[in-house]
Swiss-Prot record:
SUPFAM superfamilies: S-adenosyl-L-methionine-dependent methyltransferases (SSF53335). It catalyses: L-glutaminyl-[peptide chain release factor] + S-adenosyl-L-methionine = N(5)-methyl-L-glutaminyl-[peptide chain release factor] + S-adenosyl-L-homocysteine + H(+). The keyword S-adenosyl-L-methionine applies. S-adenosyl-L-methionine binds at residues 121-125, 144, 188. Belongs to the protein N5-glutamine methyltransferase family. PrmC subfamily. Its EC number is 2.1.1.297. It comes from the Bacteria. This is Release factor glutamine methyltransferase. One of its GO terms (biological process) is translational termination. Methylates the class 1 translation termination release factors RF1/PrfA and RF2/PrfB on the glutamine residue of the universally conserved GGQ motif. Transmembrane segments: none annotated. The keyword Lipid biosynthesis does not apply. Substrate binds at residues 188-191.
Length: 281
């Protein structure tokens, strides 16, 4: 009589034990993606048996991760404000610090007021889209020089059902919205000095030079926003910016020279991270 050998199923805990400790967090995120659950649920599922096909996909994606590909690019998505956004190589991956920018911006947008905002450098679209979801009367315009970022923003807008209130254009900074005025301008522009490029980790470089490098000094985009912002803001409008941890003073001075009242907010590590600049009434 012919014997039939049954494949032994592997449990979540056993699978994670096969991963080196330095990749444990990445493994949990990848596995949660494959199982369609939140990473926080993984410890509660240690006894769950995993289908063979998912085990194969898990090891394939872990192999990519160990080659230095960021986890976000391996799974093709990342969370921001508890919402999932599609991501791709060459487009900035959403970070926790950007959630501070979103939260501070929301504080200045009343729930019941019709407003029009502009985002310089949309990336995945996570800033504009989160603002639109939280403020149903808001309309956003956004630009990016990266065609992949523009398409990704449009895709994410459709995913989150706000594409009817988000207008995205391919182009440099304010050029696609020349002559328009907005209630506010929001941006997480590239702010790393160009001489830092060579010392950045290789996996960070995969997010793209134009996504990360802000020019020779690193704050060139803030100079541009300070200069052009006055032309594109309505009366009593405001500017909300994410900044590098050591750029608070210089960005504050740039905006104060243009008659803005400036407040700086810190990130979770205690570093300067968000600037809110409001026009004097």
């Amino acid at each position: 009589m012919r014997k039939v050998f049954k494949l032994n199923k592997v449990k979540v805990k056993e699978l994670l034990k096969k991963v080196e400790s330095e990749y444990r967090r990445d493994a949990e995120i990848i596995l949660s993606y494959l199982l369609k659950v939140s990473p926080s649920q993984i410890p509660l599922m240690y006894a769950r048996e995993i289908p063979e096909e998912i085990v194969k996909r898990f090891f394939k994606q872990m192999k990519e991760r160990k080659k230095g590909i960021p986890t976000a690019y391996v799974i093709g998505e990342w969370e921001c404000m508890g919402r999932v956004f599609k991501v791709k190589k060459g487009v900035l991956v959403p970070r926790p610090e950007t959630e501070i920018l979103i939260e501070r911006t929301l504080e200045l947008i009343p729930q019941d007021r019709e407003m029009v905002g502009f985002e310089l450098g949309s990336g995945t679209g996570c800033i504009s889209i989160n603002l639109l979801i939280e403020r149903p009367k808001l309309v956003m315009y956004a630009t990016d020089v990266n065609p992949d970022a523009v398409e990704l923003t449009k895709e994410n807008a459709k995913l989150h059902k706000v594409d009817d209130r988000l207008f995205v254009f391919l182009g440099n900074a304010f050029e696609p919205v020349k002559g328009m005025k907005f209630d506010f301008i929001v941006s997480n522009p590239p702010y790393i000095p160009e001489n830092f490029w060579e010392i950045l980790p290789e996996e960070v470089k995969k997010e793209g030079y134009t996504s990360l490098i802000g020019g020779k000094k690193g704050w060139e985009f803030y100079e541009l926003i300070a200069e052009e912002g006055t032309k594109h803001l309505k009366e009593n409008g405001f500017i909300a910016l994410e900044i590098g941890h050591d750029q608070g003073k210089v960005v504050k001075e740039l905006l104060e020279k243009k008659c803005f009242k400036v407040n700086i907010f810190k990130d979770y590590a205690g570093f300067d991270r968000v600037v809110i600049a409001q026009r004097w009434s």
